[in-house]
């Protein structure tokens, strides 16, 4: 019966005199079992899913994986086990002796004494087929099952390791982690691409809405971090962000994760750029150190040549050009762009990728953008008629924009005038108040986490580096 637990048998047969006394068996993750250097027949129990089955005359070989590593643990069983019950994708619990492997392919193997099938897997109905390398596009149809493949397993382990590495970098450098709200009445980016939130059933009574003001899913934690930067000199947040962008491009999602930081007493973009570059390199080096096999799988089967490109990024200092210089480079390019580069017009993805190639595929900071292209909170440069702001974007190979940041406008009267011109004074009076009471020069940045993963792994489509992608016309599960 489907899902029924079945005990398949024992490898060790009882002797003619007596059966050996049952021994205590320690549960062990596959990753930990594979790391044992001097296996001497310890009795262990492993739980996981069958990745392969190979039957010979007198011996049965299984490979079991529990998600803790890319590599699976080889299980060796004798012919008393019924191989028909052990199918690809089934969940099992195996008890046996961990011994040194006779094969050069692995260091250890598990000699099975008991194999228990926990959950069957019907091979014909299972969309993931044995020994088949499914394209990532195909797997997107099955968000509830695709994590069982090697490719998605590796991507998600890298994602987990990168998350830990980011927290480690900020903790080691004295940043305070702030939980910024998911529900907000602010539009940080000013783009209007917001998801408005309302109760599923309308509130009865005189109040027009649950919060008495329109509420939205956050597009950024920046403004809340700026509040905190009035009490803590270094803060960061790392959480979900939402944009109602009607786009199905390879670079955009409706729900994604942002790493954002705010630093007080910062007076130059150079200080911000240093932190951005350090964060990128420290995180990447930790990922490469802690899960090299997973990164290698992505580089080998998803993005050939990505390993060399990544090493090139890590060993070189990031470059810096101004927005004005970037426009001049684009104007002189022999490439025909779909969007003509022009001063005062935002850079498009095609422009960003060209600039990175022009800079030798080294990440490049583009600084000092025209003020009309950027939100009200960015600090105005004192550069006369150009009227630019102290903004910075980091462009990286294969992706384009990865980081965006700026110095914040800390001067009360300048900010007051910008809010007035935008008709936002009433909505952001609290933000002006921050400049009244102990204001300091400060700045910050945000990094799209999924784009970061695309960059280091070479994954072309952003929908393949997040467990459950949400985008226009798609919210599966």
Swiss-Prot record:
The modification N6-acetyllysine is found at residue 353. It catalyses: tRNA(Asn) + L-asparagine + ATP = L-asparaginyl-tRNA(Asn) + AMP + diphosphate + H(+). Keywords: Acetylation, Aminoacyl-tRNA synthetase, ATP-binding, Ligase, Mitochondrion, Nucleotide-binding, Protein biosynthesis, Transit peptide. It is found in: Mitochondrion matrix; Mitochondrion. Its EC number is 6.1.1.22. GO terms for molecular function: asparagine-tRNA ligase activity; ATP binding; nucleic acid binding. GO terms for cellular component: cytosol; mitochondrial matrix; mitochondrion; nucleoplasm. This is Asparaginyl-tRNA synthetase. Pfam families: tRNA-synt_2, tRNA_anti-codon. Belongs to the class-II aminoacyl-tRNA synthetase family. Residues 1-14 form a transit peptide. Mitochondrial aminoacyl-tRNA synthetase that catalyzes the specific attachment of the asparagine amino acid (aa) to the homologous transfer RNA (tRNA), further participating in protein synthesis. The reaction occurs in a two steps: asparagine is first activated by ATP to form Asn-AMP and then transferred to the acceptor end of tRNA(Asn). InterPro entries: Aa-tRNA-synt_II (IPR004364), aa-tRNA-synth_II (IPR006195), aa-tRNA-synth_II/BPL/LPL (IPR045864), Asn-tRNA-ligase (IPR004522), Asp/Asn-tRNA-synth_IIb (IPR002312), NA-bd_OB-fold (IPR012340), NA-bd_OB_tRNA (IPR004365). The gene is Nars2. SUPFAM superfamilies: Class II aaRS and biotin synthetases (SSF55681), Nucleic acid-binding proteins (SSF50249).
